[in-house]
Amino acid sequence: MRPVPALIVGGGPAGAAAAIMLARAGVAAHLIDRHAGPHESVCGGFLGWDALAALRDLGVDALALGARPIGRLRLLSGERCVELALPHAAAGLSRRVLDEALIGRARAVGATVLRGRAVRAADPAGRSIRFDDGEELAGGALFLATGKHELRGLARDLGQRREAPCAGLRAVLPGCPTLAGVIEMHLFDRGYAGLLLQEDGSANLCLSVARERLAGGVAALMAEIMAEAPRLAARMDGKMPAHFEAIAGVPYGWRVAATAPGIFRIGDQGAVIASLAGDGIAIALGSGMSAAQTFAGGGPEAAERWQAQWHRRSRRPIGIAEALRRGAAGPVGRALLMRLLRWMPGLGAQAALLTRVSARRTGERRSGARSAPGPD
């Protein structure tokens, strides 16, 4: 089995960003995507300013793809509502459109893209993978970009976590004019829901909730949430969506501290930020770009150094996001948060800046930025 120089498992934003940067650097990159074509994903409809800048660096114009501009956050808890300006312009775009654009860009700059191929296991010692048909492929370096899904042989070590992972749900709602230019965040007991317009005018609804709240099933959970969040119920016209996409076992706050030689863990395989921070796509893009640049300059031997640096870099933003998530999980914390933001709305913008991992200094990257973020 002759290894390829760089093997990327996962065709989401992290994997595609790594493939683009590697191909640009003249590295023969093989990108493996388990999906045969366009598909939806539970997470990732919000593009922060740092994500938009990273996409421009990669040669992808989100607004040209139809992304809906977002300039304000509307935070809702029960009947209370606070509206805040975001520190920089953001946008809403479906993962179906975003992922296809990134994979197309990777192919255009010279990466080899294999779609519709499911990887069943990995051998970290050999930096190799095994497909579901038994075929094997090895790389000089292996970039693990499987998102929230585990890969046998390289599964994340979550055994020491004190908190059970969360669950994520996604549905599509009819759009409405009151969502123009806004992302809504509806807070409720042990969870929250984000709502924004995407490119086709529909509204993307993403929920994060403590897994134990799903014990009675999705229908029972949604009935409870609609009672707790009346304004969200109004957005849903009092009806439960006909279809939900779901993912379980989301370990918010998790970061990998070390890796095996030649293995780069990027995106959610390296660090998982609470989705209320709105930085997941930016982290995916930034980690993929940074890891690829490190490999291009230092080879497979640089993986362990890069991973340790990314772990350090993500500590504060992810820690702040976790404090916000846990604080908003209960009624006392939610009430305090709403009061603080009503009295001092500037705290919202500061929190948004402090939960950025990919921006060099909490929001420094703007539309003119042209270099991928390093891990330092």
Where are each of the predicted segments found?
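Beta1/beta-strand and adjacent pyrophosphate-binding region of the FAD-binding site
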Residues: 1-14
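Glycine-rich FAD pyrophosphate-binding loop
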Residues: 9, 20-43
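Redox-cofactor binding/interface segments in oxidoreductases and associated redox assembly factors
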Residues: 9, 144-145, 265
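Residue-level detector of alpha-helix initiation sites
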Residues: 12-13, 37-38, 282
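A conserved beta-strand/loop capping segment in the N-terminal third of enzymes
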Residues: 52, 56-103, 124
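Predominantly flavin-linked oxidoreductase catalytic cores and closely associated redox partners
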Residues: 105-235
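FAD/FMN-dependent oxidoreductases across multiple families
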Residues: 213-294
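C-terminal helical "tail/cap" subdomain of flavin- and related membrane-associated enzymes
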Residues: 293-376
